[in-house]
Amino acid sequence: MEPQRRGRTLHARSYVHRQMYHTEDILYHNETYEKALRALEMGRAARENCDIVTGERAPQIVQLAGDDPEQFVQAARRFLPIADAIDLNLGCPQARARDGHYGGYLLKRREWPLLERIVQALCKSCDVPITTKIRLCDTASDTYELGQRLALAGSSVITLHARHVAPNRRRAGMAKLEHVRGLVDALGAERRTRVLSNGNVRSWADIPTNMAYTHADGVMVGEPLLVNPDLFAPSAACSHHQHYPAQCALSDSQCQWSGSPIVTYLSMCERYPIDAPMSCIQQHIQSMMRGLPPSRETRALHDALRDAGDVQTMLHLARSSSVLQLQAGAVHKDDPK
């Protein structure tokens, strides 16, 4: 999941597991660090983040942004007991990243020595993998060369969002996936650094197409996951509960309509009460509502959820909604046995 500095709750990240923080926020605003640590600890302990068949726990990656190598090291060290990897954000296109000199505004060639020093310092100081996320540089050759230099500096994974940095049109047009393939080729067949492709994935069917074209080792998805958090698990309407009911963390009533991501998300909000503002929860719900077919019933549900004042009321509305029951029923119908 593509991270954001603001607007992600633990419950949204429980489908995927990455969050971005500015190094200065972690070092100089203890409340921010303590909140981040609580969310990571809760995420690590959450039963939903553990595969009941293999016992494997989903990894949690902390993404940091900034422009000072020493601050990166200090901030990363604070997360080492709980993070499975540290990611360097070199892709944020927003105006605050430009004003703060971080994210995608460090991609100019003059900044490359600084980026190498940051990655090298993190690799030297941390005993977890160090990864990087970038966007396209001014030219294709610059993108490939920067990828090579980050790999040599120690980046275990490079995620390329195949669009240029633009604060006002940051997702305009299709991503230029040919440059992901170019980066893979530039790193070579014997590369140790893995490449993730970011862009042009809006459904499960897009994933194998993307990987076949780019030759990437995996994909990262951003905003489409806000609409459909189950994008990476098609037709998996609580398959764990269906096949392993004794081990499932959810009760029968909780799983009844678990094919709806809205019900799943609100159930997790209820089960893991952290200090996420209602405005943030509402924002996630409204994003998921965009995935429902338009109708009077959908509009009525949209308005009712928007006007609800607490998670319990929203969850009751969602569980009793015929619109979401139909959505879940369609998922269960398609679920392979």
Model-found features: residue ranges?
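Short, solvent-exposed helix-helix connector turns and helix-capping sites enriched
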Residues: T9-R13, E24, H29, R109-W112, ...
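Short secondary-structure transition/capping segments
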Residues: G7-A12, R98-H101, R170-G173, P208-N210, ...
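Conserved strand-turn element in the central/C-terminal portion of the radical SAM core barrel
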Residues: T54-D68, V128-T139, L196-G199, S203
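Glycine-rich, positively charged N-terminal anion/phosphate-binding segment
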Residues: M1-R78
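Short secondary-structure boundary segments
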Residues: M1-P3, L90, A162, E223
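Alpha/beta catalytic cores of nucleotide-metabolism and tRNA/nucleoside-modifying enzymes
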Residues: R117-Q120, S125-D127, T139-V157, R181-S197, ...
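Alpha/beta enzyme core
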Residues: E70-V195, Y213-T214
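Active-site micro-motifs of SAM-dependent methyltransferase domains
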Residues: P3, L136, V227
